[in-house]
Structures are given as structure tokens and as C-alpha cells.
């Protein structure tokens, strides 16, 4: 049994587990402008709320904790919409559980990671986003069912490949 547990720990040894949530309210998405941390891979970009798993957390546990930490509000309902696999260069990777959610009513707290603001779906398209985020946001707004998306970036942040459900490269269509 000890050998099996050791093997299980190594399966994601080269990858990071995260959640990302797009909060919906009155036809708008809650976006976080990552502009407060010096060392931030997302610096200057607008993204949803979320973050890294802590030890022992399920995707939902991570979702609830991260959303509350960043907004000060609790999740009322949520839906797991997809899993996104990110590959950067040859070795670095992360796996993201992508959610949409509705939050309790109340004022948003000040976030230590950046500025929170609601935008219409059309306004979001004009924001500085990662190219891969544009792809999965489009899938979310179209109401696609559950999906798997693989995004490959080079070291400079250029999107090289976007594979939907293991089949279709969205960059070549």
C-alpha cells in the first residue's frame, strides 16, 4: 500500500492543480485585473477568480475557499464546466478545473491580488486576456457542455495549440 500511495503522489508531481471561476450576475462576468503582485504570471491580465489547491482539497473545496478569499462572498450555486490542461514550454504544466457560479448578494471586498469588476460578455472581449482564456470564455458564453481543452504556450506566452476534447485544434480552423 505504501508503494501505491507514493506512486499516486508522483502522478501530478510535474503539474499544478488550480480552479478558475467565472461568476455570473445579470448577464455579466466578474473579472479580476491582476495588478497588485510584483511576481505574477497573470500580471496585467483580466481573469476569473480562483487559485491553487491546498493539501486535501477537492476542486469544489478549492473553489469555495478561493472565491471567498478573493471576493468576500460565498458561492450559492456552481457548475463544473471544463478541465483545461496548460503546457508551457517543454515541461511545465498545470490542470485547471473551470467553473461558473452565482454568489450571495453583497458588496465585493477589496482583493489583495487585483481589482474586481463586472463586465458584460461583449466588454470582456476587449480586455487584455490570455489567448486561451478567450477560447474557453467563448465556450462558456455559447453554453457548451462539459469540455476538455488543452492549451500549449511557448515560454514567451504565445499560444501554439488549442485542442478541444482531444480532437480539434481550434487554432487551425
Language model: regions and residue ranges:
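Short, solvent-exposed loop/turn elements at beta->coil junctions and helix N-caps
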Residues: 9, 81-88
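Short, active-site-adjacent segments that bind or coordinate small-molecule cofactors and metal centers
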Residues: 140-162
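Unchanged
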Residues: 53-76, 86-140, 161-173
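Conserved N-terminal beta-strand and adjoining loop/helix that marks the start
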Residues: 8-31
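A conserved beta-turn-beta hairpin within the catalytic core of GNAT-like acetyltransferases
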Residues: 39-44, 93-95
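Short, surface-exposed acidic-centric catalytic microdomains
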Residues: 43-49, 58
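Short, positively charged and aromatic/hydrophobic N-terminal segments
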Residues: 3-4
Amino acid at each position: 500500500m505504501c508503494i501505491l500511495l507514493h506512486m499516486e503522489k508522483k502522478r501530478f508531481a510535474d503539474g499544478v492543480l488550480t480552479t478558475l471561476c467565472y461568476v455570473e450576475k445579470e448577464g455579466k462576468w466578474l473579472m479580476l485585473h491582476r495588478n497588485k503582485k510584483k511576481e505574477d504570471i497573470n500580471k496585467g491580465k483580466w481573469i476569473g477568480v480562483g487559485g491553487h489547491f491546498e493539501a486535501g482539497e477537492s476542486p469544489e473545496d478549492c473553489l469555495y475557499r478561493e472565491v471567498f478569499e478573493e471576493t468576500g462572498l460565498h458561492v450559492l450555486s456552481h457548475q463544473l464546466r471544463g478541465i483545461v490542461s496548460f503546457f508551457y514550454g517543454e515541461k511545465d504544466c498545470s490542470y485547471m478545473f473551470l467553473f461558473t457560479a452565482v454568489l450571495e448578494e453583497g458588496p465585493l471586498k477589496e482583493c489583495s491580488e487585483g481589482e474586481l469588476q463586472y463586465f458584460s460578455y461583449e466588454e470582456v472581449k476587449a480586455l487584455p486576456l490570455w489567448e486561451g482564456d478567450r477560447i474557453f470564455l467563448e465556450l462558456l458564453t455559447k453554453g457548451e457542455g462539459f469540455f476538455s481543452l488543452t492549451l500549449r504556450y511557448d515560454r514567451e506566452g504565445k499560444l501554439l495549440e488549442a485542442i478541444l476534447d482531444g480532437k480539434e485544434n481550434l487554432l487551425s480552423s
